[in-house]
Amino acid sequence: MSANHMTPGEIVSELDKFIIGQNRAKRAVAVALRNRWRRQQVAEPLRHEIHPKNILMIGPTGVGKTEIARRLAKLANAPFIKIEATKFTEVGYVGRDVDTIIRDLTEYSIKQTRELEMRRVRSHAEDAAEDRILDALVPPPRGASGEPERGEDNSARQTFRKRLREGKIDDLEIEIEIAQPMPQMDVMTPPGMEEMAEQLRGMFAGLARDKKKSKKIKVREAFKLIVEEEAAKRVNEDDLRAAAITNVEQNGIVFLDEIDKIAARQETGGADVSRQGVQRDLLPLVEGTTVNTRYGMVRTDHILFIASGAFHLARPSDLIPELQGRFPIRVELDSLSAEDFVSILSETDASLIKQYTALLGTEDVKLEFTDDGIRRLAELAFSVNERTENIGARRLYTVMEKLLEELSFDASANSGEVITIDAAYVDLQLAETAGSQDLARYVL
């Protein structure tokens, strides 16, 4: 089922597969996504007046703020970009211009739409690729004009077509004309002139377009290259751009991370001028403006903005009032407990335990995690967070990597073995490191 037709409850259930807890944040993003579908059902001109309710997530690092937004975008198959607010500065200062957020989002949408269109025409492209490879192997008869005549396959072509589909001639070398790849050119421009750089790249890429060269390659590689070339021919670039821009305008999601770092704090000066400048530059994007991209004009009125920050040193009220008003939905995310760590390790769809079990399984090493082993691992990770910097669930990555360090290194020597990870094994590998505050600070 498409996420666009899912109820908020169904969206939360999908998010539950990957993120533990944080129900308030999940409910907020689920309602925001459902409201997009509701808006599409409203008749014009009222539809145009309904704007998304942007969300401000407040919570420490590693509790799932980014993951919620990323999974939501994946669920909705929507253009999504995550950017650090600290990378941007007020126009005139050294740093990136905030308009590049929308340009980058549009680039992502173009890529996403192109992949979708290429998949749609792939079967026709594969048929055309087969014919071109067969033309190189068994040239068709030519008519009076000298052009190849297409008709029923003769017995030789039928034989080669059958062998090609069965993969029996994959390693056979053929000489074939293929389009030259576009040159990858990097254009250096001063900050704030990214649009000019994009136009120059497009101009240089256009110089090489439609140029072909003869190349001798294996049938397997030739088939892949020709399928891509034939699929690209069948995609209408103008329609693709129009669809991609519409997708950005109606379904785009921008995740603004570290927004608390550009909040002006009362007791500091100096840099606050630039911080407030970034907020004022962001304001038109969030409330709705038109950004010029190399694919056309993009309106931001209905793009959903999700901002997040820990707000340790600043408060949401330190943001300029106009920007505060553009994020009407505020949700606080909870710090993760040891029980949450147990659930993250054992209950999520793509848990770290499943990932490491699959990785070592490729070398015929079978990992078996016991319940007490998982609990001990979670307790150690939670303990290190309490005594050093609290980096939330990201601590599980460092702890798991340290736990399986020796095993990963010697995996080939342990091929065919079953390794049981219980509490004793976890203590043996990690207790000394986790117990020492200095070691935990630098190793875990």
Curated annotation (Swiss-Prot):
Alphabetical list of Gene3D superfamilies matching this protein: 1.10.8.60, DNA helicase RuvA subunit, C-terminal domain, P-loop containing nucleotide triphosphate hydrolases
Coiled coil: none
Residues given in the record as ATP binding sites: 20, 62-67, 257, 322, 394
GO CC annotations on file: HslUV protease complex
Region spans: Disordered: 130-158
Single Gene Ontology BP annotation: proteolysis involved in protein catabolic process
Membrane spanning residue stretches: none
InterPro entries reported for this sequence: AAA+_ATPase, ATP-dep_Clp_protease_ClpX, ATPase_AAA_core, Clp_ATPase_C, HslU, P-loop_NTPase
One Pfam family from the record: AAA
Molecular function in Gene Ontology: ATP binding; ATP hydrolysis activity; peptidase activity; proteasome-activating activity
Chief location category: cytoplasm
CDD domains: RecA-like_HslU
Protein's job: ATPase subunit of a proteasome-like degradation complex; this subunit has chaperone activity. The binding of ATP and its subsequent hydrolysis by HslU are essential for unfolding of protein substrates subsequently hydrolyzed by HslV. HslU recognizes the N-terminal part of its protein substrates and unfolds these before they are guided to HslV for hydrolysis.
NCBIfam families named in the record: hslU, PRK05201.1
Protein name, entry field: ATP-dependent protease ATPase subunit HslU
Species: Bordetella pertussis (strain Tohama I / ATCC BAA-589 / NCTC 13251)
Gene: hslU
